[in-house]
Amino acid sequence: MNNPQLTTVWSSVMVEELIRQGASFFCISPGSRSTPLTAAIARNPEASWKMFPDERSAGFFALGHARATGFPAVLVCTSGTAVANYLPAVVEASNDRIPMLILSADRPFELRECGANQTIRQNGIFGTFTRWQMELPEPSTSIPLQSLLSTIAHGVEKSLNSPRGPVHLNQPFREPFEPESCSTPEPWLEPLQAWQTGRRPSTVAAQPEKHPDMDSMRTLRELTGNARQPLIIAGNSTDENDSHAIAELADDLQVPLYADMTSGLRFSSSILPWQQAFASPEFRNAFRPDLVIHFGGGLISRHPSDALKQWKPDHLAVIRNHPGRYSPDHSVTLSIEASLRLTADALRGCRTGASALMAPAKRFFTEADREIAAATAPDLPVSEIGTARIVSELLPPDHLLFLSNSMPVRAMDSYAHTGKENPIKTGTNRGASGIDGIISTAAGFAEGHGQPLCLMIGDLAFLHDLNALSLINSLRVPIQLILLNNNGGGIFSFLPVSEFDDIFEPNFATPQNFSGRPAAAMFGLDYTAPLTNSEFRESLLSALNSNRSTIIEVVCSRSENVRLHRALQARLGLLATEAFFIP
């Protein structure tokens, strides 16, 4: 067996085992050193793949795809800076515990750290952001192929086991790279005969749900049963079963449930949008729970965190399904690592009688809904608030939603309409909360689900990932991209630094003065720019009923946006004061 044949077999075995382990979608960036891997993927009938000239975009697409499917998409690249471009997506996947597998091709031993072209130190390049990383050997008949299978299987297992996250396998190859088949029997391949003729993976790994321990549950049930005023918080969660169980628990106990946008519950007709009450300082002063039970990860709004610092509840219990720490304010009194669903189920029935807050809460949210509707009346200029409200009203059940960080996700978290019988599947990048790679992640999310998607994105995040617009028309499904163009970093206008005129505009707002129209034309996308809420509603309905992808650009003023947000929050604060009888 010559070297090309050896490399071909080696790469084919790797790709086949990845597919059998469930990692069957590959994000490939063109390159010479990775030729054996690309050829093996292209020639495997069970593989699905997409080509990416930009590795950075590929990394975020893989992230979105894994968010949708629950399985790692495999990133394949050549040597050099190609692999370094994955780092932002790897950081997000690590922080948000999303499975990911990087398969980077590399130079062999004799070409490393000697001045050879396109060669960097790739092994360990992602540092602490991987769950596992391994320098694979150069293909050799002296290495049993069973060890290669076992290593691939372990890599996928490490990506999927708690805590989920990225795995990096660095594979050196020697030239030549072109595939060459081997027709003669090889003793080296004989131990793999059963594997080659079957369809099962070499190793089957289980990922069981972790049950909460009995002592912790006994304590938590007792605290919940005896609490004067409990509060349940549903934070970032990627599992629909977890979300449903938390909602059912709150209904069973008849206590308030603060459901963050990332919890999967925000749009549900059975959930009250407590964000609108928590924004009121008067409400936060009056509502003082003595027990807070926090399921899942972080929250978008800072108001619950501010409230916790103010309340200092007797007990703050955090339930998360991974071993990572979640205690941003260092006030957790009970920490449970277990399945969110199983923990929520185990808490049911430990309390009787509805919270005194529930009746006035329903009155408040009815009035708040009317106030938001008035602020987004059809003839008013379209704004970030109106955009979020209308999108949440119009999205059909078969559509996905992806929200960019900064203002889009906050506007939706605060003002979304509740009333969906089947909550919209919503994606965000809240692991590290960056604005990079948003279009790429949304495209991967849509492709992974195989459903049309609506993306809300700000102008700076749009520019940051502009080249990813080239992906949209190659997807199986259309995307409605809502570009909130306030000519700069709108979120900074809410911060104290905005009062310093001499430094704010050029150094924080950073206006870019561009339109999305030329970008739509360049990448073959439809385009519209509505001016009023009524026009935006019509544009969105038209886009939702089309099989073409569209950019809907909403041009708005940063200063006017701040005024609208603050005016509406003030009116909601007055309603909260009246509804909850705050003196």
Swiss-Prot record:
One of its GO terms (biological process) is menaquinone biosynthetic process. The keyword Ligase does not apply. The keyword Manganese applies. Binds 1 thiamine pyrophosphate per subunit. Homodimer. Catalyzes the thiamine diphosphate-dependent decarboxylation of 2-oxoglutarate and the subsequent addition of the resulting succinic semialdehyde-thiamine pyrophosphate anion to isochorismate to yield 2-succinyl-5-enolpyruvyl-6-hydroxy-3-cyclohexene-1-carboxylate (SEPHCHC). NCBIfam families: menD. This is 2-succinyl-5-enolpyruvyl-6-hydroxy-3-cyclohexene-1-carboxylate synthase. The gene is menD.
